[in-house]
């Protein structure tokens, strides 16, 4: 991230083929580094901006220059002069917010002269009265009638004063605020008539109620000084999915007989400000916090809805979107209820106030605040939009199309502007119609991957595909992808590392031999195991691996064929059964049988199971997301339930993240998005297996929902040799708890059209999250989950409660499938 202190450090250059648009180049800027280091850098040649946010308010001092720089850029832009003027138009915003549910605004009478088109149409609230003027002179009778009706209306509530002000871009921060007693309408009329003479087109004169400060009983009797008023500043940000999220709230406290303004009061937290005014009762404070959250988020929702209907010219550019908003509120009593009322919107003052409060903890020897910075969600949005901009138009080759659970790949690729070329064995795969180029090629025989990589490279060259990257999200095709990348000179982890991670026994045995340095060595996380290819191997393994153990396919996925074995006879029986039932790809497509049906026996370790999804670039850990798994239905290991984020203690969470990361590095996995399965035992994390690709099932969807980070976008960026810019310490915005549905347990539910319609309806309504993992309802001994049903909540307990209720209502919970037991780990 770069800070430009002068417009002269930036330059716009017209973009060929994109009429009216320009790229933004940075020739000089302040750069920031960990540890508080800053440098003044000169860039030769200039750098291309991938996101631009300018200070456009009157307080910025360089508003005109910044406005011109922000207009019609090809890169994502956080605001523009055009949008800023709309936000600062007090009447327009008040009219907009008055129509938003859950947002209260002061009672307002507006005299408008040739109002803007955005103000025409729609219904305002009873507390907002718009009077259109045909001219600026000869309006005395109309003004007198309207003012007298307004000051006597019930909409003003307990307000004893009204303010009269001009509204329009010219008047931002340039006028005093005259206050008048409500019982003296003649002075209000005279003030309005005097201001009407100054109006130009699309401007207005506002008469608005001054919300009376809350009179709170102070302990020990009345306060010796004047009554106090609280001014609230809320910062709300646009996050993934164009949803508003309240980031932080700070307050100013001042005299109740005059307006409390920015820069004239010291910022403090809401709870401290309320305590100063005598409000400390927890339930009341929590209720008020929720009201502020709803009002602030409702304000941004209204702005985003308005913005969606604007033309490119009205927004100031194709890439302009409002990414954050400052909301000024005041506390008042409406109908005996303490209510936050939105006074105005701004583009920077509230964020500045939050920064001033956060700056308190930067002083040496003072404890630091554990709260997230107010700008953190904004920075996440900047990074996400910047990444999307970098990937727009990139050409990627995808090896293996996967099944219905990977439908999101093709939808997201279109949204991100990616051009995809697909290599797939099935000539009739639905994804063949969703890509730029489809190459039909049999990739199921993985023992010929090296030969196939050479053949595919020739096909790519023959078609003259100009690739920026190549990747796969399908287990079976990972080694082939690495070999092809090496042949084409594209970024990827080495094929040897992919082979090592793909074969489960090789992974464990290799890590067991890694004794360090560095310390702790990866051998501490590996588990004793033995590869099995024939019956003699089974006999040897029984004596080498402590029992009970886990027997599984070397190259398997989805927990198909994985079973707990307690003694020698069970080992022999399960090995023989798998050898007979699962001989090749045709017996169970998509679980790795194209690599053969070799097995392994590994030690069974007690503990809680966890998934760690990592983003690694150049051998550096960029992000990690930990989820918890519920108990499985032994002796099988098919997943039952999951919870995100993890319920592990912070130290244990750090241990599983570091264990997963070190195991990946130990295998040579230096670049990519990886999924690592571990158990947290009494002795620390132990490795189950490494999946050298993006996490499957619901994981990408959940991480995107909770953290705003898209593992698919990160995967494609790494595949193109670009480092994803991800938040260093992402915080989850709630919890998700999910349960798997199996054909063997839920066939009646899943085959019923009405039940499936109910699931889809609940998903569309936001009552649950439905992730379809399989397309066909195929019963069998070796099954994979058909779908995942999840519920969100502010805590694991609340999410579990909602999910259990839905499972009981729909029939997912049953005697042979006790959902409450599967969720018991998450309390």
From Swiss-Prot:
Question: What Gene3D superfamilies does this protein map onto?
Answer: 3.40.50.20, ATP-grasp fold, B domain
Q: Spell out the coiled coil positions from the record.
A: none
Q: What is its EC number?
A: 6.3.2.11
Q: Where along the chain is Mn(2+) 2 bound?
A: 689, 691
Task: Describe, as the record does, how this protein assembles with itself and its partners.
Answer: Homotetramer.
Task: Note one Pfam family from the annotation.
Answer: ATPgrasp_N
Q: What does this protein do?
A: Catalyzes the synthesis of carnosine and homocarnosine. Carnosine is synthesized more efficiently than homocarnosine.
**Annotated cofactor note:** Binds 2 magnesium or manganese ions per subunit.
Q: State the organism named in the record.
A: Mus musculus
Q: Which GO terms describe its molecular function?
A: ATP binding; ATP hydrolysis activity; carnosine synthase activity; homocarnosine synthase activity; metal ion binding
Q: Where is the ATP-grasp domain?
A: 516-720
Q: What is the lineage of its organism?
A: Eukaryota, Metazoa, Chordata, Craniata, Vertebrata
Kindly list the cofactors needed. Answer: Mg(2+); Mn(2+)
Binding positions for Mg(2+) 1 per the UniProt entry: 677, 689
Keywords carried by this UniProt record: ATP-binding, Ligase, Magnesium, Manganese, Metal-binding, Nucleotide-binding
Kindly give the InterPro entries that the UniProt entry links to this protein: ATP-grasp (IPR011761), BL00235/CARNS1_N (IPR041472), CARNS1 (IPR031046)
Listed binding positions for ATP are 542-611
**What reaction is this protein's catalytic activity?**
beta-alanine + L-histidine + ATP = carnosine + ADP + phosphate + H(+); 4-aminobutanoate + L-histidine + ATP = L-homocarnosine + ADP + phosphate + H(+)
User: Which BP terms in the Gene Ontology apply to this protein?
Assistant: carnosine biosynthetic process
What this protein is called in its record is Carnosine synthase 1
Which positions does UniProt annotate for Mg(2+) 2 binding? 689, 691
UniProt binding sites for Mn(2+) 1: 677, 689
């Amino acid at each position: 991230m770069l800070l430009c202190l002068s417009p002269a450090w930036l330059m716009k250059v017209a973009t060929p083929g994109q009429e009216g648009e320009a790229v933004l180049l940075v020739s000089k800027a302040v750069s920031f580094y960990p540890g508080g280091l800053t440098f003044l850098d000169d860039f030769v040649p200039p750098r291309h901006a991938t996101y631009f946010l300018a200070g456009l308010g009157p307080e910025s001092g360089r508003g005109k220059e910044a406005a011109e720089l922000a207009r019609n850029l090809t890169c994502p832009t956080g605001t523009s002069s055009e949008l800023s003027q709309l936000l600062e138009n007090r009447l327009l915003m008040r009219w907009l917010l008055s129509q938003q549910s859950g947002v209260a605004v002061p009672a307002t009478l507006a005299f408008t002269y040739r109002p803007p088109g955005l103000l025409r149409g729609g219904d305002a609230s009873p507390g907002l009265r718009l009077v259109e003027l045909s001219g600026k002179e000869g309006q005395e009778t109309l003004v007198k009638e309207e003012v007298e009706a307004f000051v006597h209306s019930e909409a003003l509530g307990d307000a004893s004063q009204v303010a009269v002000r001009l509204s329009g871009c010219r008047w931002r921060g340039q006028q005093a605020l005259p206050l008048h007693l409500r019982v003296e309408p003649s002075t209000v009329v005279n003030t309005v008539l005097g201001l009407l003479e100054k109006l130009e087109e699309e401007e207005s004169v506002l008469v608005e109620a001054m919300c009376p400060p809350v009179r709170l009983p102070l302990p020990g009797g009345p306060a010796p000084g004047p009554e106090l008023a609280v001014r609230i500043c809320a910062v709300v940000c646009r996050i993934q999915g164009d949803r508003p999220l309240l980031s932080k709230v700070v307050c100013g406290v001042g005299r109740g007989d005059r307006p409390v303004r920015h820069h004239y009061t010291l910022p403090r937290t809401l709870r401290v400000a309320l305590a100063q005014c005598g409000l400390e009762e927890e339930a009341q404070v929590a209720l008020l916090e929720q009201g502020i959250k709803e009002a602030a988020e409702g304000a941004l929702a209204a702005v985003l809805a308005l913005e969606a209907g604007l033309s490119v010219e009205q927004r100031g550019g194709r890439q302009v979107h409002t990414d954050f908003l400052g909301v000024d509120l005041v506390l008042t009593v409406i109908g005996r209820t303490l209510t936050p009322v939105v006074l105005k919107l701004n583009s920077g003052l509230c964020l500045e106030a939050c920064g001033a409060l956060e700056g308190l903890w930067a002083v040496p020897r003072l404890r630091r605040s554990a709260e997230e910075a107010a700008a953190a969600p904004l920075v996440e949005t900047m990074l996400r939009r910047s990444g999307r901009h970098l990937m727009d138009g990139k050409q990627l080759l995808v090896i293996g199309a996967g099944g219905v659970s990977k439908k999101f790949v093709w939808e997201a690729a279109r949204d991100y502007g990616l051009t995809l070329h697909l290599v797939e064995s099935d000539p009739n795969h639905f994804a063949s119609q969703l890509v730029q180029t489809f190459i039909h090629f049999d990739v199921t025989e993985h023992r010929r991957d090296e030969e196939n990589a050479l053949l595919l490279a020739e096909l790519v060259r023959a078609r003259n595909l100009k690739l920026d990257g190549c990747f796969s999200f399908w287990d079976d095709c990972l080694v082939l992808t690495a070999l092809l990348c090496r042949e084409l000179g594209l970024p990827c982890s080495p094929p040897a590392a992919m082979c090592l991670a793909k074969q489960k026994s090789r992974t464990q045995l290799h890590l067991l031999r890694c004794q360090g340095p560095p310390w702790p060595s990866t051998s501490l996380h590996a588990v004793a195991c033995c590869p099995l290819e024939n019956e003699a191997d089974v006999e040897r393994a029984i004596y080498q691996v402590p029992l009970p153990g886990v027997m599984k396919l070397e190259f398997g996925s989805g927990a198909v064929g994985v079973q707990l074995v307690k003694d020698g006879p069970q080992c022999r029986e399960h090995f023989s059964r798998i050898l007979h039932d699962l001989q090749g790809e045709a017996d169970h497509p998509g679980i790795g049988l194209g690599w053969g049906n070799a097995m392994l026996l590994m030690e069974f370790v007690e503990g809680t199971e966890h998934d760690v999804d990592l983003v690694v670039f150049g051998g550096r850990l960029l992000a990690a997301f930990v989820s918890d798994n519920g108990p499985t239905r032994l002796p099988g290991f098919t997943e039952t339930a999951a919870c995100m984020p993890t319920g592990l203690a912070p130290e244990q969470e750090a241990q599983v993240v570091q264990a997963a990361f070190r195991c990946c590095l130990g295998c040579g996995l230096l670049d990519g998005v990886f999924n690592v399965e571990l158990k947290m035992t009494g002795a620390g994390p132990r490795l189950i297996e490494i999946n050298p690709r993006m996490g499957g099932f619901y994981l990408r969807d959940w991480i995107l929902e909770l953290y705003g980070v898209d593992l698919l976008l990160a995967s494609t960026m790494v595949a193109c040799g670009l480092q994803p810019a991800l938040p260093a310490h992402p915080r989850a915005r709630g919890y998700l708890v999910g349960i798997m549905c199996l054909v063997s347990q839920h066939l009646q539910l899943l085959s019923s059209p009405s039940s499936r319609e109910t699931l889809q309806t609940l998903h569309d309504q936001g009552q649950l999250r439905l992730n379809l993992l399989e397309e066909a309802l195929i019963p069998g001994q070796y099954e994979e989950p058909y779908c995942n049903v999840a519920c969100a909540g502010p805590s694991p307990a609340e999410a579990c409660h909602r999910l259990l209720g839905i499972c009981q209502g729909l029939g997912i919970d049953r005697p042979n499938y006790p959902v409450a037991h599967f969720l018991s780990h998450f309390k």
